């Protein structure tokens, strides 16, 4: 078990590094194209930081481990809001822009409700997968057009101060993807091994260790953004990541191969839905998430973890 745990930790570190390269390269290219920072956070950064979840869930699906694939998606969405937004808000109250309130958060909630309904019986088929993927394509195109029409913010100061050739950014993207693919395979294999040795279900491993581990890029990105007072990136990253997790990851996995995950139950789905719904009144109160509200989100996650691990603690 020590070897499996060591390899799992190393795979998480590799996922973090690979996602970092991917985000750095893709964000630089997007900003050079004069896409606004908020939309970069909602799309490029969010999708890039969710790349670990994508490759891990795809690997798990192809290996017939649906509980890890779906547990990773559900657990990551809960972790993103409860821990990442919670911690970010305690560092700096998160101001919420109108686009997030009017468009992006409602779309995320709609996707979460839809996923909960469609996965209620513990399975996702190719029809649902195609529907989800169509949704993320429409959302991404809309966000990019909206940015072009309404966005006034140009490339970030950091990008202007440190110009790089597009080839360097492309190399970072390719290198990041290669690392992600190999690290994800290592993570899934050793997560399954640890689950068997501990006598816990693969769903619990997916909802906890795998979900938290694959969310490390989002955690780092949002915390750094909060410290720099770039709260639109911090929130946009999480909202975009949660959308990506449901529409792209669940969509891709179920389109490639129908998923069955009977051990991810309705309680887990309702917790994901509940913390997502809780986000709306929080951001509407003064159009920001305060430090107190950040602590509430963290507490929500801690209570869920105690319930989930009650039989193993």
Predicted regions and their residues:
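Hydrophobic alpha-helical segments, chiefly the membrane-spanning helices
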Residues: 1-313
């Amino acid at each position: 078990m020590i070897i499996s745990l060591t390899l799992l930790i190393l795979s998480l570190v590799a996922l973090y590094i690979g996602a970092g390269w991917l985000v750095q390269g893709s964000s630089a290219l997007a900003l050079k194209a004069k896409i606004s920072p908020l939309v970069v956070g909602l799309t490029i950064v969010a999708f890039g930081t969710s790349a670990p979840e994508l490759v891990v869930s795809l690997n798990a699906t192809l290996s017939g481990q649906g509980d890890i694939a779906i547990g990773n998606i559900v657990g990551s969405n809960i972790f993103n809001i409860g821990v990442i937004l919670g911690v970010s808000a305690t560092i700096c109250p998160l101001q919420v822009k109108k686009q997030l309130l009017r468009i992006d958060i409602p779309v995320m909630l709609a996707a979460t409700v839809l996923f909960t309904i469609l996965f209620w019986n513990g399975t996702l088929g190719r029809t649902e997968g195609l529907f989800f993927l169509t949704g993320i394509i429409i959302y991404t195109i809309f966000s990019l057009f909206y940015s072009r029409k309404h966005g006034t913010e140009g490339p970030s100061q950091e990008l202007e101060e440190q110009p790089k050739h597009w080839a360097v950014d492309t190399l970072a993207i390719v290198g990041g993807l290669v690392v992600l693919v190999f690290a994800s395979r290592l993570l899934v294999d050793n997560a399954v091994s640890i689950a068997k040795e501990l006598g816990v279900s693969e769903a619990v491993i997916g909802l906890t260790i795998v979900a938290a581990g694959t969310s490390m890029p989002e955690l780092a990105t949002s915390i750094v953004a909060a410290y720099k007072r770039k709260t639109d990136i911090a929130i946009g990253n999480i909202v975009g990541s949660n959308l990506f997790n449901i529409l792209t990851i669940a969509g891709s996995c179920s389109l490639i191969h129908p998923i069955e995950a009977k051990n991810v139950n309705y309680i887990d789905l309702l917790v994901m839905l509940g913390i997502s719904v809780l986000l709306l009144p929080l951001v509407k109160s003064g159009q920001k998430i305060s430090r107190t509200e950040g602590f509430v989100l963290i507490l929500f996650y801690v209570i869920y973890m105690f319930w989930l691990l009650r039989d193993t603690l």
